[in-house]
């Protein structure tokens, strides 16, 4: 069940949900707004002939830090990784979903391509998969609102929350935009 602003505040007050830093004004009727950090991962397209999720490709991306009072320019058709300014910590019985801000979506900005779900037990910065679908560059200002987290109460606590090892925890405790670690649990059924 999607939880309301009242329940979100109660979960934050009891420190079952932790957003750091937290600003009470960011709470919306059924979500909490989150901001974008100053770190981005750019794809170095000339390092590899193709992207292979089965292989570690450590030079596929490079980390860029935006200077204070500067914006990151996301060009049309470009895809980069960013992250939330806030760290997010969830209890074992609450999951979250990152959604974009409609005002930014109307400008052509996508905040995630597929990975908007955050498992119960997760702790860290949420990596954003940013795409510019517009025909003009978009300025991304560190600290601006970039999305919103919606929280869902599970029917019971997860038996193996994220970070407990049973299902993997490749991104637990991540700081900033984290490159793909798909090679660590790559699975392919031969068909």
Swiss-Prot record:
One of its GO terms (biological process) is nucleobase-containing small molecule interconversion. Keywords: Hydrolase, Nucleotide metabolism, Nucleotide-binding. InterPro entries: dCTP_deaminase, dUTPase-like_sf, dUTPase_trimeric. One of its GO terms (molecular function) is nucleotide binding. Residues 169-191 are annotated as: Disordered. Residues 171-183 have a biased composition (Polar residues). The active site is at residue 129. It is an enzyme of class 3 (hydrolase). DCTP binds at residues 101-106, 119, 127-129, 148, 162, 174. It catalyses: dCTP + 2 H2O = dUMP + NH4(+) + diphosphate. The keyword Transcription does not apply. Its EC number is 3.5.4.30. The keyword Nucleotide-binding applies. Pathway: Pyrimidine metabolism; dUMP biosynthesis; dUMP from dCTP: step 1/1. The record marks 116-117 as: Important for bifunctional activity. CDD domains: trimeric_dUTPase. Belongs to the dCTP deaminase family. Bifunctional enzyme that catalyzes both the deamination of dCTP to dUTP and the hydrolysis of dUTP to dUMP without releasing the toxic dUTP intermediate. Homotrimer. PANTHER family: DCTP DEAMINASE. This is dCTP deaminase, dUMP-forming. It comes from Pseudarthrobacter chlorophenolicus (strain ATCC 700700 / DSM 12829 / CIP 107037 / JCM 12360 / KCTC 9906 / NCIMB 13794 / A6) (Arthrobacter chlorophenolicus). The gene is dcd.
């Amino acid at each position: 069940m999607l939880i309301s602003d009242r329940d979100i505040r109660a979960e934050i007050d009891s420190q079952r949900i932790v957003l750091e830093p937290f600003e009470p004004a960011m709470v919306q009727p059924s979500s909490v707004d989150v901001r974008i950090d100053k770190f981005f991962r750019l794809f170095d397209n000339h390092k590899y002939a193709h992207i292979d999720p089965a292989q570690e490709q450590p030079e596929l991306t490079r980390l860029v830090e935006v200077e204070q009072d500067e914006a990151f320019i996301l060009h049309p058709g470009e895809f980069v990784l960013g992250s939330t300014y806030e760290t997010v910590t969830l209890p074992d019985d609450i999951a979250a979903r990152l959604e974009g801000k409609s005002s930014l979506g109307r400008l052509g900005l996508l905040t995630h391509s597929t990975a908007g779900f955050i498992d119960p037990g997760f702790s860290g910065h949420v990596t954003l998969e940013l795409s510019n679908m517009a025909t003009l560059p978009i300025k991304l200002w560190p600290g601006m609102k970039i999305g919103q987290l919606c929280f869902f109460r599970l029917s019971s606590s997860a038996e193996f929350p994220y970070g407990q090892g049973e299902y993997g925890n490749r991104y637990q405790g991540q700081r900033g935009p984290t490159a793909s670690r798909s090679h660590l649990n790559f699975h392919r059924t031969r068909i």
